[in-house]
Amino acid sequence: MKTNKKRLCVALLTCAAAAMFAMRAQGSAADEIKRLAALMQWKPGTIAADIGAGDGQFTFAAVEHLGAEGKIYATEIDTKKLEELKAEVTKRKLQNVVVVESKEADTNLPTACCDAIFLRRVYHHLTKPVEFDANLVRSLKPGGRLAIIDFPPRAGLDPVEGVPANRGGHGIPQRIVIEELTAAGLKVEKVVNDWPENDYCVLFVKK
């Protein structure tokens, strides 16, 4: 009997910890998106894209800011994550979230479809950055903004397979992000070095 009670207590504590972690993650995403929305000057009717949306927590946080008049594309390359994203969009009955399967070198977004595009901890995973950058630029409207949120290479993290050697490990130096995206035709508008979790954010604009 004592063993069963002990197991029940452990299970309840585990569930409580998981729930607290999920709530904290949602809160963190909401706070970060609030800051990003201000930085990128989102307004009613803004069309955005979350590249490499993963589990969608930043996509769904963004929807709260974009409102019914806005729209967001959530792109993902992983098949399982794509299906989970689609299921969650259906569950939430969201009409302004479009899930898109991206490719290694292609966002698969329509041409000039977005006012704002953001990549959060995704850019350092790109194996074909030159081609992908060209796609990002193509997907932006004139005057559209691109935000790259990422971090410098960090010790203790396994290198990402297939990425260019100039990344220097798991992560990417800020100067490389700037060099590659200015070469693609974008202009740096602002650099933020105090982003949450010791990340940085580089904001570009398409002229």
Give residue ranges: language-model regions.
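Conserved alpha-helix/loop element of class I SAM-dependent methyltransferases that forms part
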Residues: 28-46
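A short acidic, Gly/Pro-enriched loop at the edge of an enzyme's catalytic core
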Residues: 43-46, 107-117
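Conserved class I S-adenosyl-L-methionine
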Residues: 44-54, 82, 145-176
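A short glycine-rich, Lys/Arg-flanked "PGG" loop and its adjoining helix->strand segment in the class I
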Residues: 63-64, 130-145
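A short SAM/SAH-binding and catalytic strip from SAM-dependent methyltransferases
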Residues: 113-130
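Core SAM-dependent methyltransferase catalytic element
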Residues: 189-207
